[in-house]
């Protein structure tokens, strides 16, 4: 059965419950009206993008039990919030259970997530595992612990998913995370590899989904502020930040400011791969390629540089301007 798509009616309804002014409140000022309008657009956009991603990749199906991994950060809060809204209007039935892994980091506020989850009325499970001590014992002081911590966390969450009978594991990675991963793998790993919106886990037993795949991080930051989620800091472990990922994040933010549409184009390119124009012999049979003698309108242009966009293509609103290819005579 198809995954849930958001329609206009559902998107219109996906605003804050308290967005409407209480009876007897003075009329909103023009500034307040503009802010309310922009906030409403933000809510609709995020819900629409999550619904679209779910539908495009068939992330959630009839009868699924979705385990939403909740860390206490803005992304996982937003993911849970939007999935609960979508479930109310989806054409299929599916269950949601929120799961938090308490890794016994010093200063972690154990009461915050249970109180929040009880308030919103969603079933939840808190898994208590002291991975913090393991990581501190194995990783030298001052080194980044994120890689080992992630591996330990992944294995625990896979086990918990099986124990809870979850059919899908939902993670809160967003558009910027996906582009950052692509750049990290290109710059430091020498490979074209991103972060898929849906995958089979390495243990072969779980399907992992990323419903926020189409959502910008800046939108999630605004959403979390407006929804007033009880955010838990992500640096309680005392680990050094991942400097390479921080570098990619800063680069993407700078591009978004200076070259509107560039990051969107990079993200969209991940869904428009042309293996015949790359160099991976496992994806395209270059070695056995022979001339067929028949013209192909979609064939390669061997001698001319291909422009970034044809002159007939209308640029999407906010998209980066295509780069013109200028030919120079040999000197």
UniProtKB/Swiss-Prot annotation:
Family annotation (PANTHER family): AMINOTRAN_5 DOMAIN-CONTAINING PROTEIN, SULFURTRANSFERASE-RELATED
Compositional bias annotation for Low complexity: 8-23
Main location: cytoplasm
GO molecular function: 4 iron, 4 sulfur cluster binding; ATP binding; magnesium ion binding; sulfurtransferase activity; tRNA binding
Residues bound to [4Fe-4S] cluster: 146, 149, 237
Miscellaneous information on this protein: The thiolation reaction likely consists of two steps: a first activation step by ATP to form an adenylated intermediate of the target base of tRNA, and a second nucleophilic substitution step of the sulfur (S) atom supplied by the hydrosulfide attached to the Fe-S cluster.
Compartments, as annotated in UniProt: Cytoplasm
Cofactor details (free text): Binds 1 [4Fe-4S] cluster per subunit. The cluster is chelated by three Cys residues, the fourth Fe has a free coordination site that may bind a sulfur atom transferred from the persulfide of IscS.
Organism: Burkholderia cenocepacia (strain HI2424)
Record's keyword terms, sorted: 4Fe-4S, ATP-binding, Cytoplasm, Iron, Iron-sulfur, Magnesium, Metal-binding, Nucleotide-binding, RNA-binding, Transferase, tRNA processing, tRNA-binding
Protein name, as recorded: tRNA-cytidine(32) 2-sulfurtransferase
Cofactor(s) listed: Mg(2+); [4Fe-4S] cluster
Membership in a protein family: Belongs to the TtcA family.
Lineage, uppermost ranks: Bacteria, Pseudomonadati, Pseudomonadota, Betaproteobacteria, Burkholderiales
Region listing for Disordered, in residue ranges: 1-33
Reactions accelerated catalytically: cytidine(32) in tRNA + S-sulfanyl-L-cysteinyl-[cysteine desulfurase] + AH2 + ATP = 2-thiocytidine(32) in tRNA + L-cysteinyl-[cysteine desulfurase] + A + AMP + diphosphate + H(+)
Record note on quaternary structure: Homodimer.
Alphabetical list of InterPro entries matching this protein: Rossmann-like_a/b/a_fold, TilS/TtcA_N, tRNA_Cyd_32_2_STrfase
GO BP: tRNA thio-modification
Free-text function comment from the UniProt entry: Catalyzes the ATP-dependent 2-thiolation of cytidine in position 32 of tRNA, to form 2-thiocytidine (s(2)C32). The sulfur atoms are provided by the cysteine/cysteine desulfurase (IscS) system.
Enzyme Commission number, as recorded: 2.8.1.-
GO cellular component, one term: cytoplasm
Motif PP-loop motif, residue numbers: 71-76
